[in-house]
């Protein structure tokens, strides 16, 4: 399923997960895909829930974001009879806000996701969750450069997926330009592990 890689490495699959935000410029992060409070994605998710008729959007909106009351409501939703609906809503939002925009941007740059393995779809999902859909083309074009091709249209075929996945994770995302966090080595360890998981599924 699209989202498996991101779910595993962002929160280990838990829709009720709340990070403490320590050392993270994104602040406290929530859910399966660790929606950032400081970057605005948490607030956008709550607004999306309300706009799309999810009653628990109004429930969360009763409280200040990141407050103890908000956190309690979030955890209750993830561990109650509504848990599956809450998890499904997080996934639908991630597709809407991250994956679909990334796919559209890549298509404009000559990379059509329907020409690739389902694992590549999961890679696009994961990279757009972590870095935002606005950087996906730059990331993939840089990866293509490491592969020795001038642009994405040259590798718009499933036969290039293995090498592209390696280049995205181990060349681009692991570079100092893309990963200069205080916990750089830990993040790079994630990239190595996630890359191998993706390759094993091809």
Residue ranges and their predicted role:
Residues 1-114, 119-202:
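Cell-wall polysaccharide-cleaving catalytic domain and substrate-binding groove, primarily
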